[in-house]
From Swiss-Prot:
Forms oligomers in its native state. SUPFAM superfamilies: Scorpion toxin-like. Belongs to the DEFL family. Keywords: Antimicrobial, Fungicide, Plant defense, Pyrrolidone carboxylic acid. This is Defensin-like protein 1. Pfam families: Gamma-thionin. The modification Pyrrolidone carboxylic acid is found at Q1. PROSITE patterns: GAMMA_THIONIN. InterPro entries: Defensin_plant, Scorpion_toxin-like_sf. One of its GO terms (biological process) is defense response to fungus.
Amino acid sequence: QKLCERPSGTWSGVCGNNNACKNQCIN
């Protein structure tokens, strides 16, 4: 699964099917 990263550089969680953080997904 892909992790999501906030603009601040801190981990915010994982990208779910709802693509809540799709713009911040990184491998």
